[in-house]
Amino acid sequence: MNEFQEDILTGIPNYLPKHPGQDPLVSHAPKRKDVLNKREKQLALKNALRYFDVEHHADLAGEFALELKTFGRIYMYRYRPKYKMFARPLNSYPANCDQAASIMLMIQNNLDPDVAQHPHELITYGGNGSVFQNWAQYLLTMKYLAEMNSEQTLHIHSGHPQGLFPSSNQAPRVVVTNGMMIPNHSKPIDLEKYSAMGVTQYGQMTAGSYMYIGPQGIVHGTTITLMNAARKFTDGKLEGKLFVTAGLGGMSGAQPKAASIAGMVSITAEINKTAALKRQSQGWVDEIHYEVNTAISSALESQAKKGNKSIAFVP
């Protein structure tokens, strides 16, 4: 058994691991709104500390309170794993059934820095599409999956693993719920509040369900939308047309590729340099320009040649 497998089986360690600090090489989530009152902040800390032995509460309480004040959430950065986060072959995972190993692979793919939008805040895409609320939930879930057999089901509620329950080999291995709010009796600020308190999370469509596949999942529909729009509002000829848009995130990153497939030139504005570089490295956008005039010149040059170059502009 290697160190990675041992760490998975350990789950939450019974000692305080060294704090890894903030990695400047990855994109981090922006600070969330400060929406909790004093009593709610105390409850948020209580909810966070429930994952740890009482002997560590004195050390962790102040640290988690500072995270809540600084980031608007308690991510438990101290418990971020030391090992690299990426989807490994199934036989690399310490699991009792292939289904559990497959889910472990999917979780790690969603948190891979080459895939996720804000990997250290456990956000895959969309700015708030969370896999888990904190790293303790990740560690516990991976441990449960390693212990699971083919006649058990793991219940997870907004990132919190409730435990393994007896089921059957025909039942789901994992049942997940996310963002459980009552629409007629809640507002966006309520979701913000309960997320900060650690009792709910928004999992988007494929972040909290561990099945994110990146911009490829939406590029087909985006291409068709662009083609239909161009045909409706132009003479129908797409070659050399210019599409100007914004956003190179996990979903919006499909836009420049869709424009190229449709035969159009595109300029996509993006404020996050890390996101733009990631999309370029993955082949979703051809060029990145940091001056608006050079971006426009490149687009006009491609238009003149009836090309389909995709250009990112990062101010």
Kindly give the residue locations of the regions a language model identified.
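Long, compositionally biased, glycine/small-hydrophobic-enriched stretches that function as flexible linkers
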Residues: M1-I213, V314
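Flexible, glycine/charged-enriched surface loops at secondary-structure junctions
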Residues: E151-I156, G236-L238, K306-F313
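Catalytic or ion-translocation cores adjacent to nucleophile or general acid/base/metal-coordination motifs
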Residues: Q204-M227, R231, E239-L242, L248-K305
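Conserved residues at beta->alpha junctions
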Residues: E270, V314-P315
